[in-house]
């Protein structure tokens, strides 16, 4: 809301819509609160920046499982698990899991190209520590899942849920803003896993974060 000419009433409505179970995109928000698409987009960018600030600071603890996944346009119907295509965005999904392997905290982060083997979707050996450093505390017990261990874990299902949410709500996202949407998804997922009250959690989030300009 810092330096904004948009009324507090419309900001409050935007927060309420974003905090709803369905969430909101810029097209929907512009129609709901009667502002230009550019204004709605700017409002949501600031609100999601607040979410990202919190989510980026929360690293996974305990036993952490992770896997390399990817988001690809629908026309890449022949996408393989090894070769990387130009439009694919490579994502590390990680979760703190209980003794039964069930996740209770989730992280999704874009993997920098320099951490990957050239031309592939695989982490380079020297890139693994940096990749885990983006999702887990240094003393976490970590495991990078591949092959049968990955298939038998909950991670593929969790990632597909996130992918469906992204496509349903935003109909495809460019790389520039993808991480902010991944943060939003994780915030929602982790809040639900904790059994938190959505209105209280979102109010606490939005009214404690410094201005984003």
Locate the predicted segments by residue.
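Residue-level recognition of single "structural anchor" positions
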Residues: 1-213
């Amino acid at each position: 809301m810092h330096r904004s000419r948009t009324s507090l009433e419309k900001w409050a409505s935007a927060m309420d819509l974003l905090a709803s179970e369905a969430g909101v995109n810029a097209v929907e928000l512009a129609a709901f609160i009667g502002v230009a698409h550019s204004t709605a987009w700017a409002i949501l960018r600031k609100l999601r920046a607040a979410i990202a600030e919190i989510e980026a600071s929360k690293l996974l603890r305990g036993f952490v499982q992770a896997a390399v996944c990817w988001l690809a346009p629908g026309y890449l119907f022949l996408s393989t698990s090894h070769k990387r295509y130009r439009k694919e965005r490579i994502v590390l999904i990680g979760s703190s899991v209980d003794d039964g392997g069930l996740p209770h905290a989730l992280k999704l982060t874009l993997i920098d190209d320099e951490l990957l083997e050239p031309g592939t979707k695989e982490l380079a050996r020297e890139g693994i520590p940096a990749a885990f450093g983006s999702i887990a505390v240094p003393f976490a017990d970590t495991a990078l899942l591949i092959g049968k261990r990955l298939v038998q874990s909950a991670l593929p299902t969790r990632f597909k849920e996130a992918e469906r949410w992204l496509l349903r709500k935003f109909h495809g996202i460019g790389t520039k803003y993808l991480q902010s949407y991944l943060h939003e998804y994780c915030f929602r997922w982790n809040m639900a896993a904790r059994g938190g009250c959505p209105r209280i959690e979102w109010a606490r989030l939005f009214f404690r974060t410094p201005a984003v300009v």
